[in-house]
Amino acid sequence: MVYLDYSATTPVNDEVINTYVKVCKDFVGNPNSLHKLGLQSKKLIDASSKQIANVLGIKSSEIIYTSGASEANNLAILGVASKYYGRGKHIITTQLEHSSVLEPLKYLEKFGFKISYVKLDKYGRVDLNDLERLITKDTILVSICAVNSEIGIIQDIESISKVIKKHNGVLFHSDVTQCIGKMQFKFNLVDMASFSCQKFFGMKGIGALIKRENLIIDPIIHGGKSTTIFRSGTPATPLIASCAKALRLAYEDLVKKEKYIKELHDYLINKLNKLDIDINSNEYSINNIINFSLRNIKSEVMLHALEEKDIFISTQTACSTGSFSKTIMSITNDLNRASRSMRISISYLTTKKEIDYFIEVLSACIKELKFM
């Protein structure tokens, strides 16, 4: 099997699985319980939170555990909207966002919120002048992802933050799902940040919203005690402990991993440039993600042709549906490219042998499936 869909999800690290199983067996108490077993679980959660905080350079009190990035994005957006709608009903975002950002914003329009989409340059980076222009006295939130999940565009979060911070009362949220575990991120540049552990070889079903300590938002889940007043529900002790382990492992030898992935990326791009395709990723894309468009073949047809050869890549993102990519359309203004896009996502587990096999099969499929 050749797995080239690491941005959709990653296989779980064996050490992470071992941690999860051990905690399931040895820590049976509800961390909200006052007896010894409950206190043991709570102590483990506190230790795990401190470990996560140390790795990310934040305070453990700033962590709100969620079921994943989608819930964290919803909590950030809906929590701010509910708390601060009296101050204003204007939110700014981009067309590059994950559906778990765009859909809650669309939902808020039903309640009178105005959503503005900042312009992008030809590389897919935020136009800072347009962002400045869009911010008004009614703006309460800007939500812009650190790394786009489809074509991997890395936004200049520091410059974006400077523009936003010139306006008192405007909060900055960033979906950092595609960069955590792959590159460093400065959490002090944003008020809130969302991520999912399944993207860095952790378990599915656990993620977090990192929220500035003194920022108050409304919860979207009510009833039931948890680690924070901002998200109800019994804390998932095994998932939290395994998340801490996965995050620590993800940042071990990060520079070495980044160097290896850069070499693989360049090797893959060189091979792809020789095929009858259009590459959508560019110099501002993270090295883990390579997006390209087929010229005369439907992406779904190619997806299943590759699957027959035990090769797995994506069309658009795993959490989105639709006939074309809004991300690529917003950058290229080319419906054909947006309708025929495919995403390869690699990791430090990917090998050159796998890439060679993928290129060999892709090349053969392009010749065989042309005009389908």
Predicted regions and their residues:
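Pyridoxal 5′-phosphate
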Residues: 1-372
